From Swiss-Prot:
It is found in: Cytoplasm. Homodimer. It catalyses: (2S,6S)-2,6-diaminopimelate = meso-2,6-diaminopimelate. InterPro entries: DAP_epimerase_AS (IPR018510), DAP_epimerase_DapF (IPR001653). GO terms for molecular function: diaminopimelate epimerase activity. Substrate binds at N11, Q44, N64, G74, N75, N157, N190, E208, R209, G218, S219. The record marks H159, E208 as: Could be important to modulate the pK values of the two catalytic cysteine residues. This is Diaminopimelate epimerase. It is an enzyme of class 5 (isomerase). GO terms for cellular component: cytosol. Pathway: Amino-acid biosynthesis; L-lysine biosynthesis via DAP pathway; DL-2,6-diaminopimelate from LL-2,6-diaminopimelate: step 1/1. Belongs to the diaminopimelate epimerase family.
């Protein structure tokens, strides 16, 4: 099976063309491939499939390192766009793809950057899913470690976002693990720790569902900015500094799609026998 290794700001992926080759993967196979000592090693595996809808170009599937399938990965979407272009699966800069929970528009901006229309942030608790009687800008969540005030949103996957005073001192691993599996998130959650520098700039660390902390999380950056704008502490165009690099997020508010722009890097091509 042929594959490519790619990364978006250090969030690394094994990307597989399921259009020109037959691909069958089990959870156990994905876990073995994800092993950084005995396999290929990655945060997520991305699978390019033929479109389910004839009006679209591709179907985009994402699997975490633990083998679980998820509906969204923003950094992966940028790498997905770069991959299908590099492999000659498409010959235009705009592409239309479906995911498990919706549709996306991906645009190759230049040789480095990809712009992703992430769609509208989802705030309705039942659709996130998140257990709450109604939408609130802030929710109180209690854990064994501490009680936190957070925003909750879906960018195609559930996100919990909390503000911290110092990103370096944030208890990302301990608190992130507790909030990821909090009982109010039936499908678990990605947990973002956001330090606001000013209304146009934040620092962010993300504990990803099924993965742990990664160098960068595109949907997490989108979620953090959406929450910050909804809470009135950020403006419409925000630079997000992650451990792996920088993303630019734009959102004009409710009823409008959110856009993410950032790099997508091809590392190498490989072949592996399954």
């Amino acid at each position: 099976m042929q594959f490519s290794k790619m990364h978006g700001l250090g969030n690394d992926f094994m990307v597989i063309d399921g259009v020109t080759q037959n691909v069958y993967l089990t959870e156990d196979m994905i876990r073995k491939l994800a092993d950084r000592h005995y396999g290929v090693g990655f945060d997520q595996l991305l699978l390019v499939e033929p479109p389910y809808d004839p009006e679209l170009d591709f179907h985009y599937r994402i699997f975490n390192a633990d083998g679980s399938e998820v509906a969204q990965c923003g950094n992966g979407a940028r790498c997905f766009a770069r991959f299908v272009s590099l492999k000659g699966l498409i010959n235009r800069s705009d592409m239309y793809v479906s995911t498990a929970k919706g549709k996306m528009v991906l645009t190759l901006v230049d040789e480095e950057n990809v712009r992703v229309n992430m769609g509208e942030p989802i705030w309705e608790p039942a659709k996130i899913p998140f257990i709450a009687n109604k939408f609130e800008k802030n929710y109180i969540l209690r854990t064994d470690l501490q009680t936190v005030l957070c925003g909750v949103v879906s960018m195609g996957n559930p996100h919990c976002v909390l503000q911290v005073d110092d990103i370096e001192q944030a208890t990302v691993h301990q608190l992130g693990a507790l909030l990821e599996k909090h009982h109010r998130f039936p499908e678990r959650a990605n947990v973002g720790f956001m330090q606001i520098i000013d209304r146009h700039h934040i620092k962010l660390r993300v504990f990803e569902r099924g993965v742990g902390e990664t160098k960068a999380c595109g949907s997490g950056a989108c979620a953090a900015v959406a929450v910050g704008i909804m809470q009135g502490v950020l403006d419409a165009n925000v630079q997000v500094s992650l451990p792996g690099g920088t993303l630019q997020i734009e959102w004009q508010g409710k009823g409008k799609p959110l856009y993410m722009t950032g790099t997508a890097t091809h590392i190498y091509d490989g072949f592996i026998k399954l």
